């Protein structure tokens, strides 16, 4: 068995449930990336990208199953979320590197602030439109069932929170909490 095959097939059983090593490793890499980010270390970017790439394969389980019977579902919102985070991380890595080279030590790349009323008036309709389009896209790709709306919110909320982070909006933390309030029960179901 190759290392790649092992990575894609290995699981830990918890009673009648199982979790893939990819999901565990991807989650641990995400946590490691967050710690590196708090310490302002450049390693946050490649570690986070690697973790998101692994999690991308988890949520497109039917595509990356290598014939395993237990991975017949794709969660396009979750997979899209990880793809979005990969692209944003690449952008962040480039911006971080540019900012570090600009010769302005000690100055933040983004200054945190609350959104203005005008920004909220643009963001709220944009979120509704984004959610509606993502919902229709995931539905057209064959995603069905009760989790279609949940998966779409996870993707939409992640896009919104990530955009908010890039702009320095303080409210993005509230959006991350809302994503987690939906996403954590989703992960355990």
Residue ranges of predicted features:
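A short structural micro-motif
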Residues: 53-56, 86
């Amino acid at each position: 068995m190759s290392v790649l095959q092992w990575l894609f097939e290995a699981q830990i059983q918890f009673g009648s449930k199982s979790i893939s090593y990819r999901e565990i490793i991807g989650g641990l890499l995400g946590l490691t990336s967050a710690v590196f980010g708090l310490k302002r270390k450049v390693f946050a970017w490649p570690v986070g990208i690697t973790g998101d790439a692994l999690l991308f394969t988890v949520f497109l389980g039917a595509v990356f199953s290598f014939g395993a019977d237990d991975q017949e579902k794709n969660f396009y919102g979750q997979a899209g979320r990880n793809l979005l985070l990969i692209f944003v991380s690449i952008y962040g890595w480039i911006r971080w590197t540019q900012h570090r080279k600009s010769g302005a030590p000690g100055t933040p790349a983004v200054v945190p602030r609350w959104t203005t009323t005008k920004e909220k008036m643009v963001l709220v309709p944009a979120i509704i439109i984004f959610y509606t389009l993502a919902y229709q896209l995931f539905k057209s790709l064959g995603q069905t069932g009760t989790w279609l709306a949940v998966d779409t919110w996870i993707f939409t909320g992640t896009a919104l929170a990530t955009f908010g982070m890039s702009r320095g909006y303080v409210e993005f933390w509230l959006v991350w909490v809302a994503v987690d309030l939906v996403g954590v029960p989703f992960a355990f179901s």
